[in-house]
Amino acid sequence: MSGNEKEGLDASDSDFDPSDEDDEAVDAETETEAEQPADDAEEATEAEPTDDESEADEAAGPQLDEDVMPDEQSEADLLIPVEDYLGAGVHIGTQQKTQDMERFIHRVRTDGLYVLDVSMTDERIRTAADFLSNYEPEQILAASSRQYGRFPAEKFAEAIGARVRTGRFIPGTLTNPDYDGYIEPDIVVVTDPIGDAQAVKEAITVGIPVIAMCDSNNTTSNVDLVVPTNNKGRKALSVVYWLLANETLDRRGAEPTYGLDDFESDI
């Protein structure tokens, strides 16, 4: 399903049916030959802030930002209080903005940082949970190469029964049946389309959908469902993965057993 010129869900404004995924075309520019595990993973080419820089930004963010969503949006409709989103720095974007992410941006701060609309983050977490609840747990793959995304991605997978690959994504994991670590998931969740470019590329090759946590500097042409969020901050990623796990379990009729503290990694 990935590989559309625009984000899959929003390009058509239609509901996604997991049963249709085999009928979707694979991106013509994607390499289709089987890949062997190699020492050099594909390098991301987009410039982005480091995890440490984002951690510093999120620490300063809540004092500067109170206007993080449209006035007509009620705080009562959110999964958690808006103050909790603020405290985690979920709303803090980068100083770069792509056209793909413009619709998820609420405003720009005086220091040049873009502020993401947390009501859209909240909405997309629910939508992503709707999608994931249609899949068998073991057919969901969470992938995160980003430092602060690894621990919450592992906890997310543990909570919902999914598979997980953190750190360097070995080429051929989804495309080379001869590789010992080869797996065949039906959907992939990634922390960052830039850092997790190899996982996204292979998902496109095999024709499975991609849910991605995207910051203001991300492009989304190979993403089927965007969850707009600060995808570099430790606390922000913990909150988003925790909410996504709980909402997915809720739609399965299961009781969440993890608290936010369980998703927060040590610095």
Swiss-Prot record:
It holds the Pfam family Ribosomal_S2. Disulfide bonds: none annotated. Belongs to the universal ribosomal protein uS2 family. The lineage of its organism: Archaea, Methanobacteriati, Methanobacteriota, Stenosarchaea group, Halobacteria. CDD domains: RPS2. One of its GO terms (cellular component) is small ribosomal subunit. Transmembrane segments: none annotated. Keywords: Ribonucleoprotein, Ribosomal protein. It comes from Haloarcula marismortui (strain ATCC 43049 / DSM 3752 / JCM 8966 / VKM B-1809) (Halobacterium marismortui). The N-terminus is blocked. It comes from the Archaea. GO terms for molecular function: structural constituent of ribosome. NCBIfam families: uS2_euk_arch. Residues 10-72 have a biased composition (Acidic residues). InterPro entries: Ribosomal_uS2, Ribosomal_uS2_arc, Ribosomal_uS2_CS, Ribosomal_uS2_euk/arc, Ribosomal_uS2_flav_dom_sf. The keyword Ribonucleoprotein applies. Residues 1-72 are annotated as: Disordered. One of its GO terms (biological process) is translation. This is Small ribosomal subunit protein uS2.
